Amino acid sequence: MAENQYYGTGRRKSSTARVFIKAGSGKIVINQRSLEQYFGRPTARMVVRQPLELVEMTEKLDLYITVNGGGISGQAGAIRHGITRALMQYDETLRAELRKAGFVTRDARKVERKKVGLHKARKRPQYSKR
């Protein structure tokens, strides 16, 4: 596709994001839609921009992202993880700064499975003494 393109895969909960970075003007495209169109919530938009703002490259790079699975917060987290990995491929010196902010580590928390005999993962039926 492009000669200087960097790639990163991000995951969070059940979402997976594929992030492609190349030099540009700061355009972010997620599943053929703009960041503002894709994420209505300002918090999700903020999460996506965090790694770029940390390394001050918001206006220097164009991002092309495909994301699937999960909900809004999981997808935002997956995109953030993917952007971080792509930035590290772009410039390895950014790793220490991104690691310090906690963006390099994959958030391993997932939904706990429902257990037999319980209403939810941990919610027990009401206890009756008599």
From Swiss-Prot:
Q: Does the keyword Ribosomal protein apply?
A: yes
GO biological process terms, alphabetically, are: translation
Membership in a protein family: Belongs to the universal ribosomal protein uS9 family.
Which PANTHER family does the annotation name?
Answer: RIBOSOMAL PROTEIN S9, SMALL RIBOSOMAL SUBUNIT PROTEIN US9M
Question: What InterPro entries would the database entry show?
Answer: Ribosomal_Su5_D2-typ_SF, Ribosomal_uS9, Ribosomal_uS9_bac/plastid, Ribosomal_uS9_CS, Ribsml_uS5_D2-typ_fold_subgr
The name this protein goes by in its record: Small ribosomal subunit protein uS9
Q: List the Pfam families hit by this protein, alphabetically.
A: Ribosomal_S9
Spell out the GO cellular component terms annotated for this protein, sorted alphabetically and separated by semicolons.
Answer: cytosolic small ribosomal subunit
Native species of this protein?
A: Aeromonas salmonicida (strain A449)
Q: Please give one Gene Ontology molecular function term for this protein.
A: RNA binding
Q: Which NCBIfam families match?
A: PRK00132.1 (NF001099)
Keywords assigned: Ribonucleoprotein, Ribosomal protein
